[in-house]
Amino acid sequence: MGNVFGSLFKGLFGKREMRILMVGLDAAGKTTILYKLKLGEIVTTIPTIGFNVETVEYKNISFTVWDVGGQDKIRPLWRHYFQNTQGLIFVVDSNDRERVGEAREELMRMLAEDELRDAVLLVFANKQDLPQAMNAAEVTDKLGLHSLRNRSWYIQATCATSGDGLYEGLDWLSNQLKNRS
């Protein structure tokens, strides 16, 4: 009987963990987002060759966020990070209209992978502070998100440097995690 209460207590009050993979084309803002969430400040970044990994504590959830470099030569390495991923954050530079088609191709290629079949998808439409940035509805359309079937997804307009929208995205991820457990 005590075990039932113990597991109930842990379910209600215990810390949950969620493995998050954050990917996107190079210069989309992934590393800036990671360290804004982790440190609450803007850091000077250089192109990520390989990955950064940090644990972000938010609303009693421990998010382990893997930020993987987005340069085209290293994108084939993304698949090595797919295993056990519960949430996928795909970061898009909303100001980069020339490469949004390329972003769509990479996203669809990843979502076709069997190891990501159960992962929820959060899209950060980043760089909303720039005057020519596409809004979330336009990014949704350009990425073809409405065509996704059998996958929970959400798009959040963000500005990594100010932090706008980042925690709203984590709220959605944490609610998805709670609904699955």
Swiss-Prot record:
Tissue specificity, in the record's words, reads: Expressed in hypodermis, intestine, spermatheca, uterus, gonadal sheath, vulva cells, pharynx muscle, body wall muscle, head neurons, ventral nerve cord.
The protein's name: ADP-ribosylation factor 1-like 2
Extract the SUPFAM superfamilies matched here: P-loop containing nucleoside triphosphate hydrolases
Sorted UniProt keywords: ER-Golgi transport, Golgi apparatus, GTP-binding, Hydrolase, Lipoprotein, Membrane, Myristate, Nucleotide-binding, Protein transport, Transport
Q: What does this protein do?
A: Small GTPase involved in protein trafficking between different compartments. Modulates vesicle budding and uncoating within the Golgi complex. In its GTP-bound form, triggers the recruitment of coatomer proteins to the Golgi membrane. The hydrolysis of ARF1-bound GTP, which is mediated by ARFGAPs proteins, is required for dissociation of coat proteins from Golgi membranes and vesicles. Involved in endoplasmic reticulum dynamics during embryogenesis. Also required for adult germline function.
Give the GO cellular component terms, alphabetically.
cytoplasm; endoplasmic reticulum; Golgi membrane; plasma membrane
Chain intervals for the UniProt region annotation (Important for the stable binding to the membranes) = 3-16
What does the record give as EC number? 3.6.5.2
Gene that encodes the chain:
arf-1
Q: Which GO terms describe its biological process?
A: embryo development ending in birth or egg hatching; gamete generation; intracellular protein transport; mitochondrion organization; oocyte development; regulation of apoptotic process involved in development; regulation of receptor-mediated endocytosis; vesicle-mediated transport
The terms under GO molecular function for this entry are: GTP binding; GTPase activity
The record lists the catalysed reaction(s) as: GTP + H2O = GDP + phosphate + H(+)
The residues the record assigns to binding GTP are G24, L25, D26, A27, A28, G29, K30, T31, T32, N126, K127, Q128, D129, A160
What is its subcellular localisation? Golgi apparatus membrane
The record ties this protein, via Pfam families, to: Arf
The similarity comment for this entry is: Belongs to the small GTPase superfamily. Arf family.
Q: Highest taxon of the source?
A: Eukaryota
Spell out the InterPro entries in the cross-references.
Arf1-5-like, P-loop_NTPase, Small_GTP-bd, Small_GTPase_ARF, Small_GTPase_ARF/SAR
For whether the record's keyword set contains Secreted, the answer is no
